Amino acid sequence: MGIKITMADKWFSLSIREAYDWTCCRCGTKYHHNHQGLDCSHGYSRGNWATRFSTLNARPACMGCHRIESGHWMERLLTDWERERLRELRDDVQLAKMYRKTKGKGELSKHWKQQYDLCLQARECGVTGVLPLEEWL
């Protein structure tokens, strides 16, 4: 059985894809809003709750690039400091327990829905490029 997709996963994924203007981070293909051909690629598996909702750990990737590159985009797109920070988060057992306790609901889900709504508002106002996202913690 695969990893269950929670409401927080849904809103986080939409936030990442909207923040990057529905553009694949590898090949640069731009997709229409809500297109199912663009995934939210996680550098470290969504099974790790400490990094599951980290913006450092996620980039949009089309299905083909996601399959080819998997999480290897981290080496290409993140700085040494960002990769080290992500490793620290990955190994933080207490953080993972705290995130897991939410079960991807409540405040966590609400936060990522708000981030998605803020991205949509920015796009409606004509803001282009990559949009900043605020981490939950």
State what each model feature region is.
Residues 55, 68-137:
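A detector for short metal-coordination/catalytic motifs
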Residues 22-25, 48-69:
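Short beta-strand-alpha-helix junction that forms the catalytic/metal-binding core
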Residues 30-34, 46, 68:
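Cys/His-rich metal-chelating microdomains
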Residues 8-39, 62:
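Short cysteine-rich loop/turn motifs with clustered Cys
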Residues 36-45, 72-80:
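Short cysteine/histidine-rich zinc-coordinating motifs and their immediately flanking basic loops
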Residues 2-6, 13, 48-51:
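Short, surface-exposed loop/turn motifs that are enriched in glycine and acidic residues
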Residues 1-9, 134-137:
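Arg/Lys-rich, low-complexity, intrinsically disordered N-terminal tails that contact nucleic acids
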